Amino acid sequence: MTTAQRDSLLWKLAGLLRESGDVVLSGCSTLSLLTPTLQQLNHVFELHLGPWGPGQTGFVALPSHPADSPVILQLQFLFDVLQKTLSLKLVHVAGPGPTGPIKIFPFKSLRHLELRGVPLHCLHGLRGIYSQLETLICSRSLQALEELLSACGGDFCSALPWLALLSANFSYNALTALDSSLRLLSALRFLNLSHNQVQDCQGFLMDLCELHHLDISYNRLHLVPRMGPSGAALGVLILRGNELRSLHGLEQLRNLRHLDLAYNLLEGHRELSPLWLLAELRKLYLEGNPLWFHPEHRAATAQYLSPRARDAATGFLLDGKVLSLTDFQTHTSLGLSPMGPPLPWPVGSTPETSGGPDLSDSLSSGGVVTQPLLHKVKSRVRVRRASISEPSDTDPEPRTLNPSPAGWFVQQHPELELMSSFRERFGRNWLQYRSHLEPSGNPLPATPTTSAPSAPPASSQGPDTAPRPSPPQEEARGPQESPQKMSEEVRAEPQEEEEEKEGKEEKEEGEMVEQGEEEAGEEEEEEQDQKEVEAELCRPLLVCPLEGPEGVRGRECFLRVTSAHLFEVELQAARTLERLELQSLEAAEIEPEAQAQRSPRPTGSDLLPGAPILSLRFSYICPDRQLRRYLVLEPDAHAAVQELLAVLTPVTNVAREQLGEARDLLLGRFQCLRCGHEFKPEEPRMGLDSEEGWRPLFQKTESPAVCPNCGSDHVVLLAVSRGTPNRERKQGEQSLAPSPSASPVCHPPGHGDHLDRAKNSPPQAPSTRDHGSWSLSPPPERCGLRSVDHRLRLFLDVEVFSDAQEEFQCCLKVPVALAGHTGEFMCLVVVSDRRLYLLKVTGEMREPPASWLQLTLAVPLQDLSGIELGLAGQSLRLEWAAGAGRCVLLPRDARHCRAFLEELLDVLQSLPPAWRNCVSATEEEVTPQHRLWPLLEKDSSLEARQFFYLRAFLVEGPSTCLVSLLLTPSTLFLLDEDAAGSPAEPSPPAASGEASEKVPPSGPGPAVRVREQQPLSSLSSVLLYRSAPEDLRLLFYDEVSRLESFWALRVVCQEQLTALLAWIREPWEELFSIGLRTVIQEALALDR
């Protein structure tokens, strides 16, 4: 920058600050500077202050200078203002050269700093102000947080805690992980990490104890961030646009009021169970998750909300809409369970009584469980509950027949302890497993007295829970959703005892008639439901699920196998955690001892060191359900697993037989479409049956539909008969003929299927009335460029693309002018993620693509050296190999040309860094060196010369030729251009006199030649056609020679015709002061 430019910069900046300096100094406005501007200011300051050192802190005054120097006075004013500025925004625009140091030493009072695109290694002076910053914004600059927080940018110092920083915004960066530098932000309240690439927060957010607002949206998180003590203050959590499948850990954020989980991967509403403990939650967003598409999404979500959220239902927002009270009531009518989600309470926390703990806790915390509802539940559960010989802690008074039960209690104490241990371990439905758990030969004795029915245990509902539906309602949902149903053998005896005991109770209470009617109705439903219970094939096994290849331990549960399903049943509440169909089971096996020893052991279990691990493979589409691994926790684990395998082996054998029959029908032979290699698919590797020995099921990655020769996945199944007659083969080829509705490729309008049939003749003019059998149609929008017929896509993958991993991106059917070729020819321009292809259209598009497409050119994308958008956006020039090769795409429609350019630039930006070049798109400008400059009129009143440019077709009888139409305020030109010529071709020589003198001689040489010209004053009228809306005729009349002439033109879209008429009409009507005559005819007459 010269001295004059530097002084001009100082004057302009000083003038701006003199006018608006008060709002800058008060902090109401932010001072925004480009980094080159700040560098020039620092250079000027250093000329008068000397070298600036990092040790200079505090307010600095300039040395005294003569007061008659205006530059020095402006400089001193600027220096004083910068030292008192409170808010600064630095914007860096990357240039071709290296970036020099960016010093912020003059800013001594900063409280708010924003960095956009600033290279942090060039930033100096942050160490002097970081301890006083209150707001920090850094975007498009960060690779790791420690670059800014620990090293203070280019200062490379060891920062102490940022004591004053309250808000930090690190969005739109390239962060892939967090680091320990976040612990320096001890006072932070607002943190924005959105639009990065973070996959796991680990524990780096646990030190932010004052954090109130956390935005970590649009990252790649798989787990909810761990907050630790910092979660106590968190009120707003935004996790939108991540990859969450589970909300485990969210229950720790008890004060959360705003939660955004939109656009994640939450599949079922049961994943929302942690929301049960978020009593302060008032806003929830689930839009875009798979569960959001459930027809009863709002009602299903309402059952997992905290009771306090139900109390505030009128103010609760779900997906931006107020949650109505009807949403809380709908789940009962729909059969949705209003039961609270399971909580991670340890086994053994259930109280000794079967009825559960004192309900006063639930009443005080939730405020929605009322005593009348409890009585209603008791009346429903009474018939269903087994006989338990102890008082219920939910009764106002113990109801016993013996007024002095002390002796009876001592007599029955051993049996009570045994039953209590069962209930403590297995929950309310402990009778379901009694036959498997009680000692042989010592069945539980029938107690002579009965206790009042009690409420369900707290472990099955959790605090603040709403009452469960009645058992008839629960069983009405079918055996798949009611695993608590007992088998007939186990439940027969308790039912008979219950009838007798209830009868005695009702005689004492005077309710025998009403209770008898209720019992009779419920017993009929019970007998009907028992017939639908699936028979158990073996005893339940106590197991611990292992998740993922690492074997992460889950919660202990029971594994039940029935005639049709395999259930994972919760220990305490006996709820079904997972239901898997046996018909989908493919393999069942025991992992070897070495693999089992490497698997983690659940803490607190007394299992043997050699506990077996059971692996089950299912044929589900969802990856999470394809493999189930269980650590067997039974005392006789090996015997129990063998018993289970004896049941599951016949099921897997049937699955293998069905798979073999299916492969026999397919004859098991494939052919690769890329290399022609024929091969048989590999047999599925199922554990011990594989040729390579045992292999863990979760490591299976083989796919039989991949060619072993070239790795391509484009394979077809060979026909059953190898001797197919030629007649059938021809019929098969004819069956590939496209349907009239097919749209194999997108191309600009008007080009149709007109081909360059003659070697030296130009392509025919566009005709929108004949598109051939491929029904080519223009893309209505940019996304249409990526749409391609499946037959053409297969042809590109097999015959054109040279790499097996090459992927199609977009294509455009367009005329192309290629350097070294005469004229232009129709091409299919295809862009992949590796190369750009030109496929010449050589024939009618009625046969397979190989018969009418010929590969002409393949250019690696990293070799592109120039992209230029032509005049009016009607052409696109591509250069490669430093200009050694070039071509011009001629869509002649600005919309399609710009759409293709945007797609091409997106593909170039997505290339790997090693392949990415620095090519950027430019736009052709008309300068004095331009080929059209001598034809334009110079207007002294305007800076730029006015003209209208259009690539069109000149209709000459039944044929057409390519021309360019150039309009100036006084003249109309028809030009012949060499589209593939160099952009720096010599322009037509300028001469005085008539324009005809400027016409260069024909033949090789200039890139443009004036074919014909007419003064605007000779234009008499314009002729349009209803049947051909892209055609027009300009009629001329020369008053001197009294001759009439016309130009019959054709454009590619009606928008161009409208713009052409609008540009002509204004100067013509200004010249004659009357309206331009426009005549519309019905049909196009080619003979005139």
Swiss-Prot record:
It is found in: Cytoplasm. It comes from the Eukaryota. Residues 508-529 have a biased composition (Acidic residues). Residues 733-742 have a biased composition (Polar residues). Residues 346-367, 447-460, 978-994 have a biased composition (Low complexity). Found in a ternary complex composed of STK11/LKB1, STK11IP and SMAD4. Interacts with STK11/LKB1 and SMAD4. This is Serine/threonine-protein kinase 11-interacting protein.
